[in-house]
Amino acid sequence: MNEAVTIRGKERYKSGVMEYKKMGYWEPDYEPKDTDVIALFRVTPQDGVDPIEAAAAVAGESSTATWTVVWTDRLTAAEKYRAKCYRVDPVPNSLGQYFAYIAYDLDLFEPGSISNLTASIIGNVFGFKPLKALRLEDMRLPIAYVKTFQGPATGIVVERERMDKFGRPLLGATVKPKLGLSGRNYGRVVYEALKGGLDFTKDDENINSQPFMHWRERFQYCMEAVNKAQAQTGEIKGTYLNVTAATMEDMYERAEYAKELGSIIVMIDLVIGYTAIQSMAKWARKNDMILHLHRAGHSTYTRQRNHGVSFRVIAKWMRLAGVDHIHAGTVVGKLEGDPATTKGYYDICREDFNPMTLENGLFFDQHWASLNKLMPVASGGIHAGQMHQLLHLLGEDVVLQFGGGTIGHPMGIAAGATANRVALEAMILARNEGRDYLHEGPEILAKAAQTCTPLKAALDTWKNVTFNYESTDTPDYAPTPSVSV
């Protein structure tokens, strides 16, 4: 039902239910402004639902609309504040799925707030009944919006200066087993790994303050290990002390204590939420600390191709939010990571400008307005025998974390660390000499292993270990005509 209200002979208002595409949320002739936030959604309408109407509904429900016309729209600049879907394309090789391009006026969002942005973009709209599924694939964040954020607290350049390590990836390891060790034994793992040649060790995502090891005990033993390893090797070392806790007050307390003990880096988990992440990033900037983010929980909404949020969007949000490290995939490891898609993630973290690169899943040009660069972290099922592949695929501005590949070494933790360091140094030398290190990699490693027993043992132990599974999230970039034409 749709009833018109007439005032002085002019139709001013219609009550009732209207199609979203007739309410101003579908504007195929709209030219996005430089200051617009643009979101690309993968829309899967219910059977029988017009894709244009479904896309317009996403625009409406993620901005100003509700299920019926409301007269209070007339009290606002409704034409300005309505999100505008201006393009709908069928997704290549995915029947019944459509890419919807939606522009949002910048004034819809609070400056410098990821929580406010996400409340609209991934809010109630994801539960909308006319849709079978909905996925946020990418976003174009205008410079005017990017400039309202702090960005990474430290950044790659300053982190390298602080560590005094240049021209190669940094090496790390996650302490294993992740749960159950006493504080003393935990600290011993940290010491052995750092002494053997790693730059960092790391708490895992779910080690906080449990009955078997209080957080304060862990921090003390870990920093004792860091200081001892630094004195022994003459190198700056670090360990990611996980300050994730139940409240912000607890997190600040733990972070302050880590600083008092001399730590250069603290860690948080993605599951603490966007407001907490930004709060810790501001603390890290103020206190000259590197902030590591473990992306715990992301696969619950990033892994499936038809519903959720792409990790490329999470990476963009986290660069804005201000973390210094983020796990971004390995390609060759045990966790999800298509090579082309993963390159897109790494480019988001490390480049000043991301051009539209459809083969890497980047649908828009993205300028980062001089925000610091974010160091990607590769971890999960990697070992020394893959060093040539890791260097080729991920470059040098990355932290390579060999957890099992260090602590599972048959000769012990220090030997595992040494194997990884020698493998990396051999590959960097080959690269600097101009050799084709990708194809000569096995030969380079075998030669280095002749004078490094730990590396030989690592190569023998894991030589046949691969994780060759088909990725569930790959780019869709075949050029197609728009259904809006």
UniProtKB/Swiss-Prot annotation:
Its EC number(s): 4.1.1.39
Pfam families found in the cross-reference section: RuBisCO_large (PF00016), RuBisCO_large_N (PF02788)
Q: Which family does it belong to?
A: Belongs to the RuBisCO large chain family. Type I subfamily.
According to its UniProt record, which cofactors does this protein need? Mg(2+)
Single GO MF annotation? ribulose-bisphosphate carboxylase activity
Q: Which residues form the active site?
A: K176, H294
| Quaternary structure annotation from Swiss-Prot or TrEMBL | Heterohexadecamer of 8 large chains and 8 small chains.
Q: List-wise, which residues carry N6-carboxylysine? A: K202
In terms of InterPro entries, this protein maps to: RuBisCO, RuBisCo_large_chain_AS, RuBisCO_lsu_C, RuBisCO_lsu_C_sf, RuBisCO_lsu_fd_N, RuBisCO_lsu_N_sf, RuBisCO_lsuI
Q: What is the lineage of its organism?
A: Bacteria, Pseudomonadati, Pseudomonadota, Alphaproteobacteria, Hyphomicrobiales
Q: Write out the transmembrane intervals.
A: none
UniProt cross-references to PANTHER family, sorted A to Z: RIBULOSE BISPHOSPHATE CARBOXYLASE, RIBULOSE BISPHOSPHATE CARBOXYLASE LARGE CHAIN
Q: Where is substrate annotated to bind?
A: N124, T174, K178, R295, H327, S379
One further remark on this entry is:
The basic functional RuBisCO is composed of a large chain homodimer in a 'head-to-tail' conformation. In form I RuBisCO this homodimer is arranged in a barrel-like tetramer with the small subunits forming a tetrameric 'cap' on each end of the 'barrel'.
Q: Where does the chain bind Mg(2+)?
A: K202, D204, E205
Cofactor binding remark: Binds 1 Mg(2+) ion per subunit.
A single GO BP: reductive pentose-phosphate cycle
For this UniProt record, give its keywords in alphabetical order, as a comma-separated list. Answer: Calvin cycle, Carbon dioxide fixation, Lyase, Magnesium, Metal-binding, Monooxygenase, Oxidoreductase, Photosynthesis
Q: What is this protein called?
A: Ribulose bisphosphate carboxylase large chain
Question: Which EC main class describes this enzyme?
Answer: lyase
Function recorded in the entry: RuBisCO catalyzes two reactions: the carboxylation of D-ribulose 1,5-bisphosphate, the primary event in carbon dioxide fixation, as well as the oxidative fragmentation of the pentose substrate. Both reactions occur simultaneously and in competition at the same active site.
The reaction(s) catalysed by this protein are: 2 (2R)-3-phosphoglycerate + 2 H(+) = D-ribulose 1,5-bisphosphate + CO2 + H2O; D-ribulose 1,5-bisphosphate + O2 = 2-phosphoglycolate + (2R)-3-phosphoglycerate + 2 H(+)
